[in-house]
Amino acid sequence: MAPVVILFFLFPTLLVLVVAVLGLRGGDDSWKKRGLKVPPGSMGWPLLGETIAFRRLHPCTSLGEYMEEHVNKYGKIYRSNLFGAPTIVSADAELNRFVLMNDERLFEPCFPKSVADILGHTSMLVLTGEMHRYMKSLSVNFMGIARLRNNFLGDSELYITQNFNRWKENIPFPAKEEACKVTFNLMVKNILSLNPGEPESEHLRKLYMSFMKGVVAIPLNLPGTAYKKAIQSRATILKMIEKLMEERIRNKKAGTDKIGEADLLGFILEQSNLDAEQFGDLLLGLLFGGHETSATAITLVIYFLYDCPKAVDHLREEHLGIVRAKKARGEPPALTWDDYKQMEFSQCVVSETLRLGNIIKFVHRKAKTDVQFKGYDIPKGWSVIPVFAAAHLDPSVYENPQKFDPWRWQTISTGTARIDNYMPFGQGLRNCAGLELAKMEIVVFLHHLTLNFDWEMAEPDHPLAYAFPDFPKGLPIKVRRLALK
């Protein structure tokens, strides 16, 4: 019998065995024997737990039926069986902060081996301790204020305007795809000095797209599956990185290297001893942080603004004011860092988009020891899922939380919606190193979008919470060019 046929018949049995093992893990009740007081909740089905209900598609601007029902029934902190493990789910902003601010002391990242295999075992998402801090420092240096001001700002504007010049009026196109082009080109230029349209850049883009599909796929390492293709794409990316590193080292020795530390690869070769696999894992992490999340946020802001013309008018007024002031001073039209810092309402729009869009809805952690919080015990070894979206959509924190209201951020410091309740990309040791880059990309995109276009939805499309927010149709839009003075 052919191996493929054997696998076909064995797969249902293997799946049942895997689910059974996961179910047994999820059924851990040793806490009862130890007299611990865990939060109320339900462990769901004996085998599957409540994972399917937890991951059921829902609008990314809501918590979803599962979370809403459980919070109403059990409170903001409850227990469940998710992803094959007993889990504490937190919709409580205080517990969320407590977990994130005690990373590595009381809690640690909790990813299955299948996820680590695809992300890379030296990925910042997986690493802990000194190596995590070292990789994080490289990322912060790469996406720090100095490079944002001197490199990313100008490159962002260049790639955004180049993309906009290709837009045709009244012809539908997917906004998500256009946002991805801009953010990907920006990152690979600053990481590897690859320019848009170059064969290596296009090859890397296709490999990365295959890689990302596997990150959110069922982890079946079988021929033809998205997960298997992602593993293969990662291996090809690492070979590509190794080749680029060797070429750069040869050029440096020959005195023909004209790039130096202008990109991340040059900086790594000069300032660290990372090997090709470590740099590849860093690259994939930075592409996710500086490309994937930024492209999603840009698409969300286009979506939200379409239903809020008052905000679009306010943005145009702000950006026209900056353009006219630059003209009056005789300055060139290219944006400066000072121009960017003046875009205060644009920052409010970004903050509101990240709050309502919930790009990172939750994270996975595991208790390293027994932890007590608000009268409850979190047993050692249990998973903990802080749900950031819960605070972002809490009516006791944000008035009318389902409404897109950028103006709320003009007075946010005086209300109940303190910055402590705002965690679009986490907090603490493992917060996103690319948050400021993402904000800048969105603001520069808004500057040129609102000054040059009106837009409308070509067909209905709404963001759903997959592993990350996404639009089933890619958010098809049509644009009309403006001639603002």
Curated annotation (Swiss-Prot):
EC number, as in UniProt: 1.14.14.-
One cellular component (GO) term of this entry: membrane
Transmembrane segments: 4-24
BP GO annotations: brassinosteroid biosynthetic process; brassinosteroid homeostasis; cholesterol metabolic process; saponin biosynthetic process; steroid biosynthetic process
GO molecular function terms attached to this record: heme binding; iron ion binding; monooxygenase activity; oxidoreductase activity, acting on paired donors, with incorporation or reduction of molecular oxygen
Catalytic activity line of the entry: cholesterol + 2 reduced [NADPH--hemoprotein reductase] + 2 O2 = (16S,22S)-dihydroxycholesterol + 2 oxidized [NADPH--hemoprotein reductase] + 2 H2O + 2 H(+)
Annotated tissue distribution: Mainly expressed in leaves and, at low levels, in roots and stems.
Compartments in which it is found: Membrane
Gene3D superfamilies: Cytochrome P450
Pathway: Steroid metabolism; cholesterol metabolism
Keywords of this entry: Cholesterol metabolism, Heme, Iron, Lipid biosynthesis, Lipid metabolism, Membrane, Metal-binding, Monooxygenase, Oxidoreductase, Steroid biosynthesis, Steroid metabolism, Sterol metabolism, Transmembrane, Transmembrane helix
Biotechnology: The coexpression of CYP90G4 and CYP94D108 in the yeast strain RH6829, which was engineered to accumulate cholesterol, leads to the production of diosgenin, the main precursor for the industrial production of steroid hormones.
Pfam families: p450 (PF00067)
Keyword Membrane applies: yes
Enzyme class: oxidoreductase
SUPFAM superfamilies xrefs: Cytochrome P450
Record-linked InterPro entries: Cyt_P450, Cyt_P450_CS, Cyt_P450_E_grp-I, Cyt_P450_sf
Residues annotated for heme binding in this entry: C432
Mode of membrane association: Single-pass membrane protein
Similarity section: Belongs to the cytochrome P450 family.
Function: Involved in the biosynthesis of spiroketal steroid and saponin natural products from cholesterol such as diosgenin and analogs (e.g. furostanol and spirostanol), plant defense compounds used as main precursors for the industrial production of steroid hormones. During the 5,6-spiroketalization of cholesterol, catalyzes the hydroxylation of cholesterol to form 16S,22S-dihydroxycholesterol and, possibly, the subsequent conversion of 16S,22S-dihydroxycholesterol into 16-oxo-22-hydroxy-cholesterol and 16-hydroxy-22-oxo-cholesterol.
Name of protein: Cholesterol 16,22-dihydroxylase CYP90G4
Species the sequence originates in: Paris polyphylla (Daiswa polyphylla)
Gene: CYP90G4
